[in-house]
């Protein structure tokens, strides 16, 4: 009996442990729940040990539908009967959150609000009611709303009673993450002030992701998309700048670690997902609106000492409240006022008129990225503040214009629409100026690093005696500097092409020119190795591997950038295929001075490797696809033994042959199109002639047939035109020997 009772008590204690939180900092440790952060693998709570585990499949990231979240809960907890999901009330801190498609998981903590996976039949949460606090609840059977709605209802109800919302829970589920009521606990302000301060301190020390990006405005959504795309591009450039080139063997790992912090920051600012709650974001908007209102005494004449938040000063100030009416920027104490509106201070304090100008006037330095981020935040804060002010003015104007004529209302709406559009355009211009300035500074930094790397490389070559390993290390740094410039250019063009194809078409020639300069500069720098054949032969394999590794990434992007979209001329079968177009452009650059093969590794060094036909002939181009060619084996050394005149002849010959290739290619298309046009004209002429001939034949046949009918006569018979059809028919019958029996009968009687 006693062992059985012990087992029952143990089972009951285990079931209770699954419901009661054990650690407020880590969330509901033993309760089934999932957490998501876009760009990283989903996490779920291990109900056995209270720790967060990564996605079992290693592939799934943030989910944007409540149905999908419920299904995912059922997948990660197959042994539990998951019937519904609901957003948690408090955020949780998760360590070592793995990025998607990356093995390393050591990152700084992330704070997100998880989803609770509800097991079995719904049971409302048991709320603790501290001393001096009140337990309240609201139910509406005609309403089925989300967790966010009922949280707002509970908070406003507590605010009306001059109390703070301490805790709350959902009641009466009516759908996935939808309910018909809420239970909550309201506590006096003094009881909650410590909780508010500690929560603010925790948020200030952590990177909290609330599941949304910066506030969008309807008229500027497109500019926002462009800005986000450009910021992502700048992020990629800054990641490259953070690379540590000193470690030659483990450079890739160092670069990956350097990219980690900014990639996470980009994800937090640009990821838009519905996997975490928007409760706090909505509350922040309400707080910002409340704290931006002017203090109102109200219609009553009492003299009650209260506090309000002064936006211009960034602090709370006293005023006298009349006792009724007014607005919500009305607090009993200064501490409570600052606890509520303190979060508004950074936004308003940063929005100085010259916030962006300071960045533009300050020269770039090693902390360029940090300065750019601060300038961007100040710009967005200023824009949000100005838009909020316009929206408040618009709302007030609409209230005052309710009784005005329809034409006046329309004029008011048009005025504020134009004002909003003007602000959006101004903000877009400032963003563009900010990004362009940052891009220019990044390019300048890349140029400086490349110049320094080239100087070190040349110095290593000129050393007596030259050290092959040192030369290779300097060459490796120089090649990486060039490749960073190349990748930066390609990524910039890719982003521009995605957000503004017209602008991409305009800058395409500039991008191609810049890439040609990079290719030529690299070829000239690599040819310096030929001056020292011993060093070149010793590091040949390493250089081959270096160039192949550095070029693999950029070739695909370059091929996509160079390829033009096909244009239909009414007969696509006559146009060259996309593969042919890509191959032609890759093999025949714009000015014929280089090709992608010029950057491939070489396999021969020294003066003996110069081709015998250098003066009169250019090596034929391999027309196979790049994937089939592999590493080129054409010699690239011996340039030091070729005279300047010979180099000029080779370059001119190459230009002539490449240019000729372009001419022939286009002439074939033109002549082919002309042949097709002439064939179409001949076909049309033949068709018209055929129609005319057919018409003549038909008319001739009709006339012949008519003539045949009219020419059949057995004698001359005069027919009165006035006779009836019956008489005419009888006459024809008589012509053919027909005799009317009636007439014959009467003739016989007469005879």
Curated annotation (Swiss-Prot):
UniProt domain E1: residue ranges: 28-189
Function: Functions as a cell surface receptor and performs physiological functions on the surface of neurons relevant to neurite growth, neuronal adhesion and axonogenesis. Interaction between APP molecules on neighboring cells promotes synaptogenesis. Involved in cell mobility and transcription regulation through protein-protein interactions. Can promote transcription activation through binding to APBB1-KAT5 and inhibit Notch signaling through interaction with Numb. Couples to apoptosis-inducing pathways such as those mediated by G(o) and JIP. Inhibits G(o)-alpha ATPase activity. Amyloid-beta peptides are lipophilic metal chelators with metal-reducing activity. Binds transient metals such as copper, zinc and iron.
Segments of this protein annotated with the region Interaction with G(o)-alpha: 713-732
Positions in the Extracellular compartment: 18-682
Family matches, as InterPro entries: Amyloid_Cu-bd_sf, Amyloid_glyco, Amyloid_glyco_Abeta, Amyloid_glyco_Abeta_sf, Amyloid_glyco_Cu-bd, Amyloid_glyco_E2_domain, Amyloid_glyco_extra, Amyloid_glyco_heparin-bd
Membrane topology category: Single-pass type I membrane protein
Signal sequence range: 1-17
Disulphide linkage map: 38-62, 73-117, 98-105, 133-187, 144-174, 158-186, 291-341, 300-324, 316-337
Species for this entry: Saimiri sciureus
UniProt-listed GO biological process terms: adult locomotory behavior; apoptotic process; axo-dendritic transport; axon midline choice point recognition; axonogenesis; cell adhesion; central nervous system development; collateral sprouting in absence of injury
Pfam families: APP_amyloid, APP_Cu_bd, APP_E2, APP_N, Beta-APP, Kunitz_BPTI
Residues with site note (Susceptible to oxidation): 687
Region (Heparin-binding): 316-344, 363-428
Location of region: Collagen-binding: 504-521
Residues that, per the record, bind Cu(2+) 1: 147, 151, 168
Protein name: Amyloid-beta precursor protein
Region (Disordered): 195-284
Site (Reactive bond) location in chain: 301-302
Keyword Phosphoprotein: yes
